[in-house]
């Protein structure tokens, strides 16, 4: 009973807090201004304003949000009485006449004049010290642009072509001068300012203010934006001035390709950034989690947060490609910045949908990100000796921000965070791999020297006698642990495949039902097999055998983890390092227990002497023949004959075994009873004797009765915490990815794996747990199995996501509505849509867009994104005027010029049937060489993004000369496509309105591509 009580109490004491931490958010303080310079109420009101409409980059609402942000920044600076500058043009010097009475509408594009340079040193190579420098500068960046390419999606067969992109940015950048920054306007693009170190470098906080076209952007990324605004307020509050300068980047264009962050890199302020904090939202509400970090040094900054959350396992998932989505973090890391990626991560069912609004998040969630950001930025801005100096990778053309070291980190109950270097973990791994087996071998050697190594001991002949050998039964229980573990694990993983086959998305809304089923199944199967083995053949060595098998298996796993640490810099193996260390200590104690046993030769001699003393006893002598005080039945020949099972032994019954099952559930490992000693143990001078537990080997009577508790405390509490919270985080992040096209089996396999790892610490003691616990778990298993097989996987709180797009052929007027997702549920949604009634719904795959989904299409209601026809006139009549495209071929050359203009959109794309090798957008800035415009394999698409409405694109395109052809012999064909993404006005996209109105409550719609509506015209040149 003691084993049962202790294990139940320990598991409950750990699991309940873990679930509370996982499911709840720490309460925000009652005082909204608990930090001087922060105002939670103000931030919440800002979030409400920011998220009151869809505001993708290609929408009018996006412009309104941007203007509001400019005004809001100036209001914050005004309220703090801060002197600041404003400016737009990257080639301009900010006007110093602007002070705290500036207004957003007064921001003008400034030009360079002699007055702007008053107070500067005549020699621009020297530091020009001004008497009064503005504390902040607002850059209204309407100049920076970006040109590059990306390879087509993974899974497309054949050569991977590129998707080239030209993007015009309109970011908002706020610079807050630090006390150790230079006092001049060093960002001016005049030599030598842009090519040298400016002070000790600055720290950037980044958030994007655009949303997707189907989400209000409260969490993605409104929370990050209002947090950034509060950081502007905090660091410009008197008394909070940072040592190192702070750059607040509010970028625009993240959702469609991380374009805002990429455009920022061409701004002069980009050379000042040494460290960064990226704020994101990949869920909707909950806690903000540390997704990943560039090194251990910056991670220590986040560890200062009041409620840190995260594990390096998530960073490994990104690094190894298991997590396919990306954030602005990858842009800054590639530039050489050192920093952190902090994001909300669940529930993913609300991500990019109309439930990403203020109603479905909370002030508590906002405070969790805000308080963590303040603590992180305080650390990064005050530690001025870090993030400065030669780079560890010796890369040229990147900021000189010092040497970072790969890190390992994980939180404990959301209260504190452990951070250390990967090299430290690697050293621990090697030490455990090398030292632990040597120590166990040394202990085994010492036991053998003292003739107390009972493991694997068989029959032993008494010394100096010719009588038959005495069986010590040391092999009993030697192989039961791996066999039972394999069977239990196989059945548990088999249940995962069962759910994948019959109800593959039940984990989407009922992950705890899946967890409960998996945990209870593994526990019940393992207990039943192990308790059965103990009932049939009880062994005092069961526990030490189990620990040694765990040690051997863990050692093999640790070898793999160590290889990944060394070669691939994967840090998530810390789980197995800690696990193996705990198993080693428990196994070490298990071996040391054997020192308490009598020597084997004394046991054999005693058994032989007792055999000689018993006249008429004709059974083969063995160690259990030692006389010990107990029931007369145990001393009888009949009891002795029953001790050895045979083919005639009853499965349940017999004098010896009738008491075994009951004894197995006693309150301790063995009972202490004073008794006179006859035989072997008397030679050791013992006055009292203990009898063996149940029908275990009689020589085991002197084994300690308390060491199991020490072993369990080493194996259990800490490892249950570490494994449990990693399992909850990783599984929680993946359970709702099935509707995105991710593998449906993966969440179930992970639940099975972590269920085994969580139960594993108690497995060496499992046979001592009373039948009440497995009976309870068996009932849970039956109930959850039935539920998981028959329950509907979605609900109004956990909605299935379908991906929407409408395509229009502007030449013919034909339009097609597409819903993508898991086909079974997409067809169920379409069945309720009136315009799709009586149509033949065709479904298929399209790996070029997104793998793992089915794309179902029908003829839909015509869109009205361009209001160019009178009321009552079919929209098709105006399609041809939505976009105009003209293609001019250069005579005798493989070159053409595209003139493209479109109404009410800032985004178009040219799709080619065959690849091209070069392109140039008229008016674009010259490439800085960071990226290739076109990859070596060529591109077949050019994405074009303007910052202004109704502007014409002029694009020159060149393509290669094929073998056997001359230049000018070949042309190109394809389609010119433009996107419309503004869904704020009801009736602009009637097909989407219809889907949202008639789809079931358990479903939601989100965007499929960059545009909700895609209009196209064919070209041949």
Task: Label each region the model flagged.
Residues 58, 310, 381, 770, ...:
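Eukaryotic basic, amphipathic alpha-helical target segments in cytosolic regions
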Residues 11-14, 436-861:
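Alpha-helical transmembrane segments of integral membrane proteins
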